[in-house]
Amino acid sequence: PTVKKKMLEANARNTVRSRSRTGKPTRQLQSAWTDAWASPNALQPLEMPLQGVLSRPAMDKIDKRASLGHEGAVALSTYYVGQAVGLMNKEKSVKTIVYEFMEDYVEAVERLSNTLK
C-alpha cells in the first residue's frame, strides 16, 4: 500500500536510476533509501547479485514496517518504476485497464482503416 500510494503521487521527476537494490542500474521511486545510496559519503553498491543479497532483507523489513505506518520506513520505501509513473494517477482494476487497452486498439484500427479508404 505504501509504494502504491507513492506511485500514484509521483511524476517522472520522482524517479532515479540507482544500483542500490540489485547492483545493476534500475529506475526506482526516489526515497530516503536511494538518496542515502547516492550520497557522496555512501559506499558503492556491490555487483549483482551480491547487492540484492545485501538489500533484500532490509527492503523486506522496510516494506513490512511501512505497511504498519512506521514513518521512517515509509520514507525509505521504494520500488522499481518507469518514468511513465506520472501517468498513473488513480487506482484502477486490471479488468478496467485491459478494457481500456481493447477500446484504444479498436479506435486505432478504425482510424487506420479510415485512412486506407
Regions found by a protein language model. Name each.
Residues 1-117:
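Conserved active-site-proximal phosphate/metal-binding subdomains
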